[in-house]
């Protein structure tokens, strides 16, 4: 199982990544990878260095009952160093396990858009992008241009500033959350409220997760 509030299971056929934008400063996966390496786990012997795990590809086929599955919680499926041929293998497993619903979240929206420009999105995949600041709202447009009948979602986590006006055309779900821990950058309650109001106006589902905020936030 997983502590991530908006999913049920995680599947990591890739581990490791590189910091890509300001939301990566206090990366949970980076810290956890170092810890797991120190514990001697073979899968994490490379620490946070990008690593493909072919042996992990078949794992979802062993899960009997349907699950909501977050893909690559310890990496980014659309990292620039992940070959499209390997992503094809991941998608083949997804298609062969229609009982599961897979959530794919990326900070590399332009690569995801390029990948799906020549490929169909599997019927059991939700696609999402991370938008933590105003300067990264361009990622939303890349998500919107992908042809899919399935859920498109935004993860505004960690939310680092007021995002301003959002075009949520074709977006089904928005997740908002702040950082946790002693060095967490504070999230202001009015930033969250503004996103919530825009979601309500544009008929988009809204979900908040744990947050370090100035003021309490509880809107689920």
Feature roles, as predicted:
Residues 1-70, 76:
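N-terminal [4Fe-4S]-dependent radical SAM core
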Residues 8, 25, 41, 45, ...:
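Generic intrinsically disordered, low-complexity segments enriched for polar/acidic and small residues
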Residues 16, 23, 177-178, 212:
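Glycine-centered flexibility sites
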Residues 52-211:
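Conserved AdoMet/S-adenosylmethionine-binding subsite of the radical SAM
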Residues 213-220:
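C-terminal accessory extensions appended to soluble enzyme cores
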């Amino acid at each position: 199982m997983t502590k991530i509030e908006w999913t049920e299971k995680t599947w990591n056929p890739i581990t490791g990544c590189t910091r890509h934008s300001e939301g990566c400063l206090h990366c949970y996966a980076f810290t956890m990878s170092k810890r797991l390496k120190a514990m001697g786990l073979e899968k994490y012997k490379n620490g946070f260095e990008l690593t493909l795990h072919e042996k992990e590809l078949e794992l979802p086929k062993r899960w009997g009952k349907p699950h909501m599955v977050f893909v690559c919680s310890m990496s980014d499926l659309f990292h620039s160093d992940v070959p499209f041929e390997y992503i094809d293998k991941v998608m083949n497993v997804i298609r062969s396990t229609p009982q599961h619903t897979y959530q794919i979240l990326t900070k590399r929206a332009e690569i995801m858009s390029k990948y799906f420009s020549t490929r169909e999105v599997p019927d059991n995949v939700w696609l999402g992008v991370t938008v933590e600041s105003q300067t990264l709202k361009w990622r939303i447009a890349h998500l919107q241009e992908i042809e899919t009948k399935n859920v498109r979602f935004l993860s505004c986590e960690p939310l680092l500033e007021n995002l301003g006006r959002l075009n949520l055309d074709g977006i089904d779900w928005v997740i908002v959350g702040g950082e946790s821990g002693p060095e967490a950058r504070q999230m202001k309650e009015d930033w969250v409220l503004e996103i919530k109001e825009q979601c309500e106006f544009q008929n988009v589902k809204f979900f908040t997760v744990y947050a370090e905020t100035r003021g309490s936030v509880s809107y689920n």
